[in-house]
Amino acid sequence: PREGRRLRAAGTAAGRDRRRKRTENRRYGHLAKERGVWYHRTAENHSTNAKGDSRMAKELTAGELAERSLITKYRKTIWNRLIGGCKDYELIQPNDRIAVCISGGKDSMLLAKCMQHLQKYSDFPFEVEYLVMDPGYSPPNRELIEQNARTLELPIRIFESPIFGVVDEVEGGSPCYLCARMRRGYLYKEAQALGCNKIALGHHFNDVIETTLMSMLYGAEIKTMLPKLHSTNFTGMELIRPLYLVREEDIISWGQYNHLRFLQCACRFTERTESHEEDSARREMKQLIAEMKRHNKNVDINIFRSMHNVNLATAVGYRLGDDDELHSFLEKYNEKEKM
């Protein structure tokens, strides 16, 4: 009888072990394959055993823990959405060489860590450079960027540009707009010199819907922030936005969970300029969206989807690009009348 009890106990334990492995394989095996994505993890790398997790937490560095949190705690809210965006908008192709542009803020730091992890486990090869431009940061701000890069184990390349000095000498206009335009040009140039064919920026879901509303309410036009676009000044270069589907609240949560402190706006012009048009307008859009969500919780996703479902037949006027002339609905209207 005693031997029988031992055999039954062993059988029960083996059964539990088999069930646990099946659960782990369902949870971690070929993560995001539902989207047909070229990324996979195996159950052996992600034990859900509590003791194993505790032991692993003691052995992992802060950078490794931050990376691991992407495919555990933030798997649904950040990782799967990044993978979905890369797949849906065809952002990354085999043998790409991508410069992840790091400003020091929460968005670009998260993007860099995501791209680092993705490169390790992608089913096809691509290369990543981690590019930091110093436009004239104060020593404490630059040190914070370098410290976060060390913590997250990101092999950054830092290059300097005179942007802050140039913008400081320009009178009139928007310093923020000029700075942003110059930044992108310098980033394209440096990335191209490194042999990259793409730069990756940290714009996210909230940036997209806020930009859409800003264009309507302040620009008197309907346009949005695209998930990728070709450079008009640097031949063969593209810009991609892998965080296109990731929400800002989840990015903030990831940073707090990993005890990270990121650079806020490091521009010295914020201290002496009373009103920054874009920052002010963007804050208004955030408040407007939050107010509308009190009455309709799907407002943000509906704004986002509206730009994926534009019906030109109902537009009074439209252009097919920045260089195109303005077309009127009357062009087609009068043609139908002649028919």
Show where each model-derived region lies.
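Nucleotidyltransferase catalytic core that binds NTPs
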Residues: 1-34, 38
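General small-molecule cofactor/ligand-binding pocket signal
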Residues: 26-29, 129-131, 155-159, 240, ...
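Short, structured coil segments at secondary-structure junctions
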Residues: 21, 152-153, 235, 258
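The feature marks non-catalytic terminal segments
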Residues: 260-339
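Short histidine/acidic/glycine/proline-rich micro-motifs that form metal-
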Residues: 8, 132-139, 268-275
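ATP-dependent adenylation/nucleotidyltransferase module used to activate substrates
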Residues: 55-214, 218-222, 226, 249-257, ...
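Short, Lys/Arg-enriched N-terminal segments with co-localized hydrophobic residues
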Residues: 30-55
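Catalytic subdomain that performs nucleotidyl-dependent activation
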Residues: 127-128, 207-288
